[in-house]
């Protein structure tokens, strides 16, 4: 899919400058997104014809499961209506939205279970399935998934004392920072030590247009 790469040089700068980005990065990202928009025929942050993005690590050496990923980035309560009109499938759209809020809340905002605590998002999901008498996530209706989006945002606000970001650009920078930060996560550091991967390499960040694996039973995605 169409996309662009934020290089390891930016990662190095990020750590050398107290997790701040180079001044020129904002303009570079804006120009790169415009190229993706041209290719995909959609616009990032546009409620009428939204472009959603994936944000993944691009480390020089493969580090499976060690680095963070954010999918379906670029959604908010206004843009979801445009995605529904564009796709004609409300259930798919709210499934995408609840997955995004859950992943962003975990990976970027840091809402994770403490100790033996049950994951707060999974707890709400299980409650919703029980309430509607279903066993599988894909059996939940569009209405139930829409409710989950609101409940996920509410638990983020309650636990973290801050709101889920509605601005797609803010979401993007948060996700890029989360990928950079995962390079210095405990698991990633231990993995590099075991595999002999230099710590100073840093990671790039790959930003791509979304490819969906949840549009139906005949739909899937994978990483090679």
Regions found by a protein language model. Name each.
Residues 1-224:
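Nucleotide/phosphate-binding sheet-loop regions of phosphoryl- and nucleotidyl-transfer enzymes
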């Amino acid at each position: 899919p169409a996309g662009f790469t934020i290089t390891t040089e930016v990662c190095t700068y990020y750590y050398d400058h107290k997790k701040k980005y180079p001044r020129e990065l904002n303009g570079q990202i804006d120009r790169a997104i415009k190229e993706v928009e041209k290719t995909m025929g959609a616009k990032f942050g546009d409620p009428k014809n939204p472009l959603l993005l994936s944000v993944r690590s691009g480390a020089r050496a493969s580090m499976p499961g060690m680095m963070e990923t954010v999918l379906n980035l670029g959604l908010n309560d206004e843009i979801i209506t445009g995605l529904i009109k564009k796709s004609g499938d409300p259930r798919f759209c709210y499934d995408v939205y609840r997955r995004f809020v859950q992943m962003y809340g975990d990976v970027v905002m840091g809402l994770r279970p403490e100790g033996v605590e049950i994951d707060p998002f999974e707890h709400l999901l299980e409650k919703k399935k029980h309430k509607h008498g279903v066993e599988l996530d894909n059996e939940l209706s569009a209405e139930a998934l829409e409710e989950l989006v609101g409940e996920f945002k509410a638990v983020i606000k309650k636990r973290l004392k801050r709101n889920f970001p509605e601005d797609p650009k803010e979401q993007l920078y948060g996700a890029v920072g989360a990928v950079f930060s995962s390079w210095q996560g405990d698991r990633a550091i231990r993995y590099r030590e075991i595999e002999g991967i230099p710590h100073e390499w840093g990671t790039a960040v790959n930003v791509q247009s979304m490819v969906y694996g949840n549009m139906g039973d005949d739909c899937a995605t994978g990483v090679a």
